[in-house]
Structure formats: C-alpha cells, structure tokens
C-alpha cells in the first residue's frame, strides 16, 4: 500500500469513528431530553372525560432550566392543583402521646430578643406546622415588658412562626389582636383577629394575607374567640366567638366563613350554659369543639357544628373526671353529659378533650386549684357514659411543681388517618413570680402515637433568678 493509500485509509477510519461518535452524542442528547420531558409531562384527560367545573387555584408556574452540552432547554413544570381540605379520613388509633416540639422561649429570653407572649397555639397547613401567640408589642428584656400581665392592649399582635422557632425580632406580625384563631382551608390561611375597646371591639377576618370581612361586638362586652385553631371543611371554616359576661350568661355565636367572608352566623343552641375558648377539631362531616364554662361548670362544654346546614348542638363531656381548673377532687367531681355540674364553675382555664369511640382522651392541670402541672389520660366510657371515672394510660407532661397554663388541640392529616396533637402553655412571671414585672410563656407540644412511650416532665425550665426583671 503506497503512502497515499495509507493516508486515505487512515482518514476514512477516522471519519467513520468521528461519525459514530457524533451519532452517539446525538442519541444521548435525544434520550436525555426525552426522559426529562417525560418526567414532567402533564397528563391530559382522555377523550369524553367530564372534568369538574368548580373553581380551582393553580399555583404560580415554575420554569425549570436544564443545561445539556451548552444547549439551554426550557420546560414548564405542570401546575399543581390546590384543593380544599375535607378531613374525611378516620381518626388515628393511639395508645398515648409522644413529645413533638418545645420552643424554650423563656430560657432563650435570658440572652436574646424574644417576644413577650401569651395565649399560644399550633395549627398546620397541608405541609407544615406553625406556632402562633399573642405578642405584647415588646421583647422580654425591654422596659415595655413591665405589667404585661394585662390581656387586652392595642399593642398586642398575632405572631406566626414555624413550629419550634421562638418568636424572635424577625417574627411576622399577622394582624392586630388580643384574641385570635387561625386555620388553613387547603388553599390559604384564615386569621380571625379581635382588637379594640372592651365595649366595642372588632373582629377582622384576614384570608390569604388580605382583609376580607369584619364584625363588631354584638354584646359590647369583650368580644373574644378560641385562642386555638379553627377548622375548615370543604372550604367552609367555623369559628366560635363569645361576647358578654365571663361569669354569667354570655352570647356565643358560631361563624361560618368562606375564603374570609362571613356566610352565616348561628347562635349557640343546646344545653351548654357558658362557652368560651373552644378547642376544635374536624369530625367529618362536621366540627367538634370542647370548651371552657367560666360560669357554672368544671366539666367542659361540647359544641357540635354541622357545616352543611349550620345547625348547632351542645352538651358536656360525660367523664366524671372533669377537665377544668379549679375543680373538685376526682372522688367528688361529677358530670352527667347534659348540664354543667355546678362544681367550682366560676373561673377556669382553656383546655381540650376529644372523643375516641365511647371513650375520651383529655388533658388537664394536675393541681385542682391552680395552673400547675399537666397530665393526660383516657377515660373509658368518658364520651358516652354519665360520670364515668375509669382512667387508663395516664401521662405526666409537666410535673406538679412547675407551672402550666392554657392548652389546646390541633389536628394533623397523615396518609391514612388524622392525628390529634396538643400544646401546653408554660406561663412564667407575674402574678406568681414577683421578682420580675413581666408575664410570658413558652410551649411544649405532644402528638398522638400508636407506639410505646416512656415518662418524663417538660416544664418551661427557666431559672427566674437569671431572667431580666
């Protein structure tokens, strides 16, 4: 083979190899692009399939950019449909409660800028849980924190952070409020915020960050609401509000709200005599609330809300082991399901309970007279049998030597069931701890578990002698 032939042969082989490599690169590029587009391909409905006509919200479109061998390819990710929550799954079967979260706000206040708060609660959107509280318009290490034992001032605002994040200076102030409730309907947050003069307060209804509706005081005597989460089913949210005396008959109404707009108001009906600070949970197809009777009963009122026809039924928790504070000792206390027990009914504390078939799970202070300690347990027959007192699965959340406060319920939807969780307010400062001039709180949070669990105590834990005065 002469030199020219060798050159031609080598060139031909090189060209062939280069062509093969080029074709392979094209094949790889085509395969990569095809697989990427297929991953985000929007499925179209088959022919003749009927699609729902009700309004839906589509999240803001997102564009994904992929770089392949210096070529930019853009493909729009499919819009994600956002639907109202319906809470139709069954309630989770539990054996008790396991620790979930603790924010340690008071301990952190000894060396950092943390808000002075009270009336905390927890609520979750479909993807994340948040903690709320009513701030006093000041941090703890600030002279404005003096005399923050007062409940109602124009400086109080509703604070909102991810659960477990203390209320630092960067915390969002959702609205002006000295009484509040919040819930997520599956599409956006609803906040009910009460503020103003005691004799002529205003409740603002804020949905998706916008003021949508409002209502003024109807009895001119401290309009107030739940201090825990409201509940939304298929786009209709319910919130229990009371206006009137805290120690005699008051005027309680249940408001039905759709995307921030009041669509109906129902008066309280049934045998409950006094209803305040309800802890509500979804009980499909309705809403159930366990509340505070601040007039006649140390047994807790129950309010059942029908979301479809706006009807209301009320009664009392049947358990003879009653949930309010103050109360009689367990030997002497009673409850017969329908009426207040007239046992140390004047005064009380926000609390919770929820039904489990014929039984009831509940939490309460360990002390019968003061907001000290906290315990949970199940009462067999406590939801259906008058004066039932068989207690099982008792747990200590806060030992009796430490302070507690308000407590309330919130619900979390899992893959197959709805779990019940609760929080406990851990109050510190005035009136009991007179070394300091402020009153504030931290929280501890537990959730239902079907597993096993141990024992412990989870108090606030701050050494009052180390705290700013």
UniProtKB/Swiss-Prot annotation:
Residue ranges of the region described as Head of neuraminidase: 91-469
GO CC terms in record: host cell plasma membrane; membrane; virion membrane
Entry keywords, A to Z: Calcium, Disulfide bond, Glycoprotein, Glycosidase, Host cell membrane, Host membrane, Hydrolase, Membrane, Metal-binding, Signal-anchor, Transmembrane, Transmembrane helix, Virion
Residue numbers on the Virion surface membrane side: 31-469
Positions annotated to bind Ca(2+): 293, 297, 324
Membrane topology designation: Single-pass type II membrane protein
Glycan-modified residues: 61, 70, 86, 146, 200, 234, 402
PTM note: N-glycosylated.
Entry annotated with the keyword Glycoprotein: yes
One BP annotation, GO: viral budding from plasma membrane
Positions on the Intravirion side per record topology: 1-9
Localization per record: Virion membrane; Host apical cell membrane
Disulfide feature: 92-417, 124-129, 183-230, 232-237, 278-291, 280-289, 318-337, 421-447
Active site: 151 (proton donor/acceptor), 406 (nucleophile)
Activity control summary: Inhibited by the neuraminidase inhibitors zanamivir (Relenza) and oseltamivir (Tamiflu). These drugs interfere with the release of progeny virus from infected cells and are effective against all influenza strains. Resistance to neuraminidase inhibitors is quite rare.
Coiled coil: none
Domain of life of the source: Viruses
Chain residue ranges for the region called Hypervariable stalk region: 36-88
Remarks, miscellaneous: The influenza A genome consist of 8 RNA segments. Genetic variation of hemagglutinin and/or neuraminidase genes results in the emergence of new influenza strains. The mechanism of variation can be the result of point mutations or the result of genetic reassortment between segments of two different strains.
Domain topic, free-text comment: Intact N-terminus is essential for virion morphogenesis. Possesses two apical sorting signals, one in the ectodomain, which is likely to be a glycan, and the other in the transmembrane domain. The transmembrane domain also plays a role in lipid raft association.
Complexes and interactors: Homotetramer.
Function, in words: Catalyzes the removal of terminal sialic acid residues from viral and cellular glycoconjugates. Cleaves off the terminal sialic acids on the glycosylated HA during virus budding to facilitate virus release. Additionally helps virus spread through the circulation by further removing sialic acids from the cell surface. These cleavages prevent self-aggregation and ensure the efficient spread of the progeny virus from cell to cell. Otherwise, infection would be limited to one round of replication.
UniProt similarity note: Belongs to the glycosyl hydrolase 34 family.
Protein name, entry field: Neuraminidase
Species whose genome carries this gene: Influenza A virus (strain A/Memphis/4/1980 H3N2)
Lineage: Viruses, Riboviria, Orthornavirae, Negarnaviricota, Polyploviricotina
